[in-house]
Amino acid sequence: MYGTWFTTGKVTDLLARTGLDRVPVWVPVVLGVVLMAFVGSVRIDPALQGWVSIGTVTLLLVLNRRRGRGITVFLMMLSLLVSLRYIVWRLTATVQFSNWLQTALAVLLLLAEAYALMTLCLSYFQMAWPLRRREHPLPEDMAQWPSVDVFVPSYNEELSLVRSTVLGALDLDWPADRLNVYILDDGRRKAFHDFAVEAGAGYIIRAENNHAKAGNLNHALAVTDSPFAVIFDCDHVPTRGFLRRTIGWMMADPNLALLQTPHHFYAPDPFQRNLAGGMHVPPEGNMFYGLVQDGNDFWDATFFCGSCAIIRREAVMGIGGFATETVTEDAHTALKMQRRGWGTAYLREPLAAGLATERLILHIGQRVRWARGMIQIMRLDNPMLGAGLRWEQRLCYLSAMSHFLFAIPRLTFLVSPLAFLFLGQNIIAASPLAISVYALPHIFHSVITLSRIEGRWRYSFWSEIYETSLALFLVRITIVTLLQPHKGKFNVTDKGGLLARGYFDWDAVYPNVILAGVLCAALLRGVFGIVWQFHDRLALQSFILNTLWVVISLIIVLASIAVGRETRQTRNAPRVSVRLPVVVTDAHGRQMEGHTHDISLGGLAVGTRLATPDMVGGEVTVRYDSARDGIHVGVPARVLDARDGTLRLRWAVRDLEDERQVVSMVFGRNDAWAGWADFAPDRPLRSLAMVFRSIGGLLRRRPAEAPRALHEMGEGELPATEEKLEKQSFVLKPVPRSARHGATASAALFVAFTALVPAAMAQEAPSPDQSGVTAETPFGDSNTGVVPDALPAIDPAVADRISDAEVTRTLTFRNLGATTGPLTLRGYSPLQGLDVVVPANRVVTHAQLTLSGALSPSLLPEANAVTVTLNEQYVGTLKVDPQHPQFGPVSFDIDPLYFTGDNKLNFHFAGEYRRDCNDLFNEILWARISDMSRITLTTVRITPERKLSRLPAPFFDPNQRSTLRVPVVLPATGDRGALRAAGLVASWFGRIADFRKLSFPVSTTIPASGNAVEVGVNLPVDAEGGRPAGPMLAEVANPNDRWGTVLVVTGRTAQEVEVAARALVFSPDTLGGVASKVVSDVSLETRHPYDAPAFVPTDRPVRFGELVGAADLQGGGFAPAGMTLPFHLPPDLYTWRGRPFLMNMWVRAPGGPVVDLETSRVDVSLNNNYLQSYTLSPPGLWRKWSERLVNQHAGAVGHVTALPPWLLFGQNQLQFNFDARPIDRGACRRTPGDIHMSVDSDSTLDFRRGYHFAEMPNLSYFAEAAFPFSRMADLSETTVVLPDHPDTGTTGAFLDLMGFFGASTWYPAAGVTVMGADEVAQTPPKGDIVVLGTAAQLGGAASGLLARSPYVIHDRHITVGQRMGLQGIWYLFQDHDHAGLKDGVTANLNAPIAEAGVLLAAQSPYDSQRSVVAFTGDTPERIHDLVLSLRNKGDLPSLQGDLVLKNGDRFTSYRTAPVYTVGSLPLWLRLDWFLGHHPSALYLAGLAGAGLAALGVWAWLRGWSRRRIARDDLTGEL
């Protein structure tokens, strides 16, 4: 696109040899920017971010020691990368919207930070490559040189200020017949006219002063005709070579409309003069003129600054003259010309010098005008809009305009800590560590990089002081101008004033003084909070952080206040330090050669060895000649002091020619301001020290208050009334210099005149306290002062089936589920109940309920009671006895006919405490039923009915809540087919049992009593010992117990046994009411990953009605019992940056005058973690009517709830708790109690934004949802490795595990592969692997299967094995777990496993995307116990990491193995995860991105610079 990247250097040679120099520059830029953006958006743990930050800061410090623009561009890219990571962190991790106030404050701070980041980017863009344009030579033929009009506009400035500018303009080194100097006097003062006549300058006035300075210039353009116009403000005196060094570019480039030069100020600005050490700091304007404008020139976006510039008449007239719509006519004029396609240029050489604003208040006024003007341009002629500008120019103008919006962001940064210290609002929700590793590197990189770029033009931290001095004044201007851009007028900045005495300017600093007082109060509040108040760790950290923030803000504000300490200014003509060779001739003709120390329009100091005290009072002639500059000076002066080899002289100007010569000597020299940038390179620490030194200036003794003398007139003296000219348009043409006198002739006359100077008159030097300033002396500076410091019923037809043996059992309410304490009934919640379960193979013959508890003694006995019912049948009533509020034990017999399988025991409370009316929410309306109350049931067994159609009865009773046991009989041969079939049946029972505890004790013989399942080849299928005729299922009596039943799963071969098992589990509804049946095989559909029926689909929204019945989502009363929504998820759902999943919930509550919907609410919790509360208030009228037309949820109140991924597990439960309040219906008004509230079954859960991806090994995923084995519902990608001859304990553990799998997936394990340990070596297992057995049983297979585990089991001990390769380095990057895992100590693990169970997870040695989970231990019983722990909810939190040891009831978890991953992510998300877990890779990727971007940008900038300046000799270093 732009040709080759490089032309010189080592990089160029390398790229040329590899052919990469022909790659377009946009390629590395795009690649680098994309990589930087990706790296910038990756979130990592703060501790890891700390290492990344250390790396970037170290690199910055190393590279910053090397010079070169390529390094600078790279450091800019690196800085932007660090800042991008910071702002992304701020936006995604630190913002909490708890209330409207915190929201407003947090958003305001974020906007301020966004502004700061935008400003940083724009600054880098502007200053990336200053052009460093040099002067263009003029044609040798002077006849080709153009005519030039020089305009010096004035309004109310004093003549003494304007004289020097006009005389300097008249003395420009340019052909006299082509130089026209005009005074544009909007003040119409006769004195100015007379001076113009005397000096030979032109003089222009107009009839009406419209549009201020812009109008004045437009009028002058209308009455003059030169092709070029040069503009000087009335205090800007040019050097003689101004035109010779600038016009060349205007002639060489006919498309150039403007060439701007710097505004240099030879007098110190308020910051330099008023701050201690301020003179050692670059002037406030230096950065703009020394760096920004030069950068703008690179982009062809130089701003016109109103003075010291050459304008092409054709260009400015083509836009209708100078812009008059805003108060910054200069910048707006340049914008208009550039919209028309004109070019601009900037020559970074100070060719004129003027006066800076003397006082802070004047400086503020000037900046207020600039701010108003730039904001006006933004509103009225926004450069980001409209045609005519390239994008680079738009960005440059955006930078200039947006700069003056700094006031609100600056103030926001200063006062933000007050939000916490005074209002208690935490607007940055982050730990100090996180802030340190994100914010501090951002600030550090910005400061150091800007310091490198700005160098000697602007010192670090001083921009903050400059902005703070103006901020509070600019806030109002910023807002008003944004809203009303046409308001505001042009104000002339006063210059050249004097101060008789120093004083503190309250008018300029009082806003900051008030702000400092507020910050001091905040500091005291912070210290008080840290020292004397008691806080938790987080609160203490917040106090410390915000207090430090206040200290930083206070330092900046105090430094800005120090600027208001105005120092004495008694010189009308500031001194300029310069060393010039001069010759001083006294009255006796004695010539003394010397060098000046300083000069001014008032005098000079000359160092000469011949100075003697007797010269004081005498007159001398000072001669200075510079053939190079064409300056010849010979002006008389009076000796004021002569000592220590220094003569202090005051000019004794006799006429206009003398005055011109003095101006020429002081201002006309071509190198007069060459030292404008002679400041030491910026060093941030030194600069910070200067800030503290400046603050120390406030501690100096305050000077006496004094009237403010703004100019040289005496106190009480009124300005003289100036004679004005008539209001009319008038043009006085300038007199050519040749018609006045030539420069050579002037020099000759001067020499002759000096030869006639008489002897000096005897005169005493004035006393030191005399200023030497008089109204008559336009150069009135004596130059001698010292610079100042700055649960059915029995059917009779089946009664003969009942056994004679009765069993009695007593259950407390705790056993029935009241685990949280007594049942509490209240006026607004009068109903509580429990489930009483009677086993399906038993019938109740006698039942008794025994209750204890208490009733409120404040209730009326005749109107209060607790009614007890069982399945809506009356059982009894508890009466109130105010004298004895406690009751019990009270017993009630219950009719056995009331009982069914699942029974509802309910308690209904009716309470009143007064006879007229009652408040249901009164705290005295209560009753409590003790959780130690009990029910005693006597039951007998029913003769079993053996029919296959009743399966899974009698083996499984769905009403049972206690642990279920299903004995299994297996042959002792360890047949693999029988094992697979038994496992399939066990998983079917597990799927039916779901959350209930279930175990499968294994034996090789029929148990002595009870029921059992027998699986094997060629088993008897009837009492006569008949054999199967094929795959067969049969229910036969237990030969040892007539009440027991044995389910036989058999066939003639092992394959037929498996067919019988599949028929049992997949088509039990087709078996019919028979005791035995030969079955056929079942055809099964191919399963797909994550299609387990237990799992909520993640590819579509899921209705609540798909998970539970609608009745489960509704309740009665004002505070119904909590509603629950259980659901299962695959635990490997991964979202980008932990983005929450969404729940669209719709709730319904009775309308009308029943429930106070405004104060009623529904609380939503996830896995007992509170999420959010929502009002039951309906939507607005318009939304309500629109929903009736298009919404299926009409009448419901909708809410969207975020479900955080870190609160979601394999097994989950949403809880909804309604808390409604009745409407206040007045006294003695009945409040309806039979109300219903519900969660709409059409509410949805949406997990579509999740990807299946997980970090392994992770035993918590296995314990929660059998992951990763449950990924395939039929376990078709799972292999179970058992000992070759497993005992009953190991086989029982296997079946229990299959039951666990079935419960986890709700699908039988039809695809599982079972193999022996000895088969592993010949046939490596596929897929995910489960290993069951002791180390002795498994033999060498165990070590092979666990080859990638860091653990070794040997000699009844488990130890950490030898690490290999770079694994030790990997450990450095492991995360720190806070859930009780013993990270970092496992290297010394050497634990005995005697009488212990071991659960271990590792990566498969056969497939890096597969896992191995091993159940092992000292004995098979320990392994069985460990498997049973998977069904115990209380044990699940202890099962995590990659190793679990179970000793008795105690679990110990460890994590040692390196992390591996399973699943897949899109490429961009995989990279995000990878970089987020590998800080070194993140660091290197960031550097690569910054390097690529910097390489491309550097090459592009370099090429652009070559095109901007075609000749190498006309630009600086590229």
Curated annotation (Swiss-Prot):
In the N-terminal section; belongs to the glycosyltransferase 2 family. SUPFAM superfamilies: Nucleotide-diphospho-sugar transferases (SSF53448), PilZ domain-like (SSF141371). Its EC number is 2.4.1.12. Residues 765-785 are annotated as: Disordered. It comes from the Bacteria. The gene is bcsABII-B. It holds the Pfam family BcsB. There are two conserved domains in the globular part of the catalytic subunit: the N-terminal domain (domain A) contains the conserved DXD motif and is possibly involved in catalysis and substrate binding. The C-terminal domain (domain B) contains the QXXRW motif and is present only in processive glycosyl transferases. It could be involved in the processivity function of the enzyme, possibly required for holding the growing glycan chain in the active site. This is Putative cellulose synthase 3. Residues 1-731 are annotated as: Catalytic. Residues 732-1518 are annotated as: Cyclic di-GMP binding domain. GO terms for molecular function: cellulose synthase (UDP-forming) activity; cyclic-di-GMP binding. GO terms for cellular component: plasma membrane. It comes from Komagataeibacter xylinus (Gluconacetobacter xylinus). The lineage of its organism: Bacteria, Pseudomonadati, Pseudomonadota, Alphaproteobacteria, Acetobacterales. It is found in: Cell inner membrane.
